[in-house]
Amino acid sequence: MGRSVANEGFIRALLRKDPFAAYHFYLSDNNQLSILRERLAKEFGGMLRDGRFVLGTHAQLPQALRQYDFHCFHLSDCLLHNSQLAMLRNRYARRIFPVTGCTHTLSYARYMPLFLQQMWAGTSARDVVIATSRAAVGMVSSVFARLGREYGAECNGFALPDIERIPLGIDLSSLPLPDRAARHAVRAGLGAGDNDTILLAFARISHYSKMDLLPLLRAIQRLGRMGIGPETLHLVVAGFMQQGDTTPHVLGGFAKALGIRLHVIPAPSDTERNRLYGAADIFVSPVDNMQETFGLTLLEAGAMGLPVVASDYDGYRDLVVDGETGLLVPTLGPAATLDIDMLSHLVFDTATHLEMAQRTVVDVPALAGALHSLIADPEARRRMGAQAARHVRANYGWETVIGQYLALWDRLNSLPVNESALRSAQHPLRTAYADLFGGYPSAGLTADMQIRWSRSGEAVYRGVEQPVIYEGVADIVDAELLRFMLFSARKGISAGALTVLVADRMRQVERANSSAESGAEIGSGNAESALPDSFEPDPSVSDLSQPATGVTDSPMLECRAQALLLWALKHDFLERIPQ
């Protein structure tokens, strides 16, 4: 899949260039971290051993944001967690750094709410959607404009992420220029003579999620009427095929009926891919599907010295210099799609993509004309292919593209932001659980509620009894912090006073842990606890909302302290004092 290839290429190129002191990866769970750690060990073992990577889960982001001074956060897709990360950054981070994400497929109906999430007061001037093509820039701009109009005043005045265009790149080292002997061998295997022309279409073989190749077969049929017989042509269709997909069968039957020599090569390896590029004469890609946004295979073909005949569609038009590195074929799209729009959230995206693709016309006569001009003129093919190789290798290698990212992040960090406004912003789509579900329990915790340790709590404090702490709450229920809280409540104390004391202690622990930070994993347990053996609480402090002196982000720390207090009440380590 193009998305996976692009994301891996981005990370690999960034780490090879190595412009930063450390690289942090935060994934959803420890299983994903284990897989990533294995991959890093294979390709970047030295950096891993030197502590250049910090690996953590999403749940550890608040701790990491307080602990490290980040240059930027970059997501592999602009529709993953941009707004959620901006919320966490605004609340926890030492500074307002850029949050960026790259476009890939933009056509799924479920994406509209994800764009809406990014329209809020907490979006900073340093937050950017990185669109890979002019078409993607236009689409994302249209989405934000439409949402602003449809939601009216609720969105007016909300900040929007900026949109910058940076293309995807390719790993040029994986695309060596063709070898003459290998070219001859592959062509012989296909039954292609020296004077035959091989047309290569390399993409996911799917009429509903990539491109409909039947119009290409019709264009080849037209070539016969233009003096180029099918006996001199070979159409090679290569790429991933979904199990059970009937597309290859349909293509094969239609090609046979038209007398076209079709070779279908499913899921070729990288080596086989390069051999096919080297054996071909023209790369053809009449894409018609809005699932496509960029077009990595056009760059690969160009880097291998092939002229490209492609539809003038989406990101393709950015990659082909028409008349110099290849030829663009005009396309025609629908003026209205109300019937599709109304069903798009109720049917599979593949059905929507297919319907839209079948209303997107790649001009068959123009496609035939473009192919004819290159088939009939081998010198033009060689000239365009050589220019394509120069153009792609000068502009689209990952090492070049990564430089554009680094320049963007530096520029974004220099932009002014209203830090106080950002830190106070509340996302309108945030699920405020205490407010929304406050009617579920009999009552809520109050500041004047009097509590003390129970017999079980005293036993835990003295080490006689060990609490059972579920893995999912281990970040809140720290054993040493629990002992501190129990000791502080031994004589009786208000919930408000205990909350502030525990929050203040959390701040001290975090400062101690920050001073002991290293290039280890988040939560590795290397930093020692800074809790004292005993601490006399100040009973005069009783307001849950009162900030403890010097506490960074007191409301958040007090929220976590309340969580520990409630957990201790739940498990009978604290008890309420009857009034």
What is the role of each PLM region?
Residues 124-181:
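Donor nucleotide-sugar binding/catalytic pocket of nucleotide-sugar-dependent glycosyltransferases
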Residues 278-292, 306:
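Acidic donor-binding loop of glycosyltransferase active sites
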Residues 307-310, 320, 327-328:
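Short hydrophobic beta-strand element within catalytic cores of glycosyltransferases
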Residues 267-270, 276-280:
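Short alpha-helical donor nucleotide-sugar binding micro-motif in glycosyltransferases
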Residues 7, 33-122, 503, 575:
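Extended catalytic core of nucleotide-activated donor transferases of GT-like folds
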Residues 286-296, 317-318, 335, 339:
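Nucleotide-sugar-dependent
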Residues 171-267, 450:
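Conserved catalytic-core segment of nucleotide-activated headgroup transferases in glycan assembly
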Residues 347-488, 494-500, 578:
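C-terminal amphipathic helix plus adjacent low-complexity
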